[in-house]
Amino acid sequence: MRLSTLFLAGSGSAVLAAPTPSLMGDLLSLTNDIITTVTSTIVNDLASQVAALGCVLQTNANQHGQILNTAALTIEAIEVAAKRFTQICNWSKPGKQYINWSTYKANGVNLGAWLEIEQNYDTEWWAANVGSFPDEWTWCSTVGFSVCGPILEKRYASFFTIADIDKMGAKGINTLRIPTTYAAWTQVPGSGLYSGNQQGYLRALTNYAIDRYNMHVIIGLHSLPGGVNTLGIGEAFGHDAWFQNSTNLDYSFKAIDSVLNFIKTSGRQNAFTIAPINEASDNFAGFATPAGLTDAGVNWINTYIKGVLARIAKVDKRIPLMLQDSFFSEMFWSPFYPAGTNLVIDSHIYFFAAAGAYSQYVPAAVCGQAKYIGQGDGKFPVFIGEFSLQTLYNNTLSNRKTLYDTQVYAYQKYASGGAFWNGKMLNNVDGVDGEGMLQDYWSWEALADAGVVSNTIDQSYC
């Protein structure tokens, strides 16, 4: 969940005249019979369609574990301590070995808004090229791939380059999380997302990062055919047809097979983790809350993830799968997968919308809450796949290093580390509550230039 993905939804209620009890009973009885028959038929048909893809439709969503909503953290006012701490972080250096996320410690950065585009992260480029269109799908569908394609190719070649990898490597970054669209991996008939030379640019950058700096790379599918969350990052605004659709599931597996082939042919197979889904929600009114996924949505995600695990196993079980938790926490997903599954849970923690999140109070909250989010029930490791520095209130430029150092330290102490969102933000249009502009709190490279990111953790609150 980035700044561009937070929306608030309300619900209304209607007052109706009460029908007679007998009529109500008849209607309910008839409706229940119809719903039961239709639902049973739909589920059976879907199960057959999923079976044809070599999968089993999951139906045990009610067996989930505890929900710990990472998007609804409450920050309490405290007396802020003056002391800051210098901490030593032993970042992992995997070498030629496959990593174990239970012991791996990631000092990561996201390369977002590169192979999937987001308006907030490069406002001038968006205004000059995409204009008033809300997302890539609408833009390319309107102007045609012959127009948007060459523009996107230029962006792929320039937004992140080996110079950026050098900058990150110099600051001790050992992990890259790289979001992509499914169109980078497979062509879906009727899709408005551009399929071009994304893999070529990804290959050049990841080969360099792995060979020069021994970085580990998480390849993420931020979108899936049909849309996973009604947001632009999920495919396009208003799209959520990925759920309960076997055709879209089939194309999702085709994308996964392409990612696996990319990894297998890299000559660096040990250096990758696959993240097959991101911030999924089949009930957008409840996005980033426990209401954001229905039981049917949970079942569909588990059907997909178990299918992905089976495909990974055909290549090499040592390649980890990273499951983004949809803001539900590791504990929620834990019961669905047996111990020993090569699975790591990806949790996203942001404070730009957290209740009571004044900048001065957040570091103490991080120290207290990271343990519960990062450790879960202990069955599967947790990686904080996205975090930033913006808080809801009273942002100050001087407090950024404490916010950065505290999160980096706490997430490696209690979890498997984290990845800052984002590597770049070029946005001098949008402000924040307090000092500075949005990009002052969301751009890793700008933070590095300002001395906020350094080679030492010396301003941690804990």
Please name every model-derived segment:
Residues T20-I173:
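N-terminal carbohydrate-binding accessory modules
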Residues M1-S22:
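Fungal secretory targeting signals
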Residues N107, Q375-Y461:
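Substrate-binding cleft of secreted/luminal carbohydrate-active enzymes
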Residues A209-Y213, V315, Y414:
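Helix C-cap/helix->beta junction micro-motif
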Residues A106-L115, N174-T180, H216-I219, S223, ...:
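Structural recognition of the beta-strand scaffold that forms the well-ordered cores
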Residues K154-L176, G190-S223, G234-T273:
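An active-site-proximal structural segment forming one wall of the substrate-binding cleft
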Residues F85, K254, N261, T265-T273, ...:
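Extracellular glycoside hydrolase catalytic/binding regions
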Residues A184-V188, P225-E235, N283-G286:
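Short acidic/His/Gly/Ser-rich catalytic and metal-binding motifs that mark active-site loops
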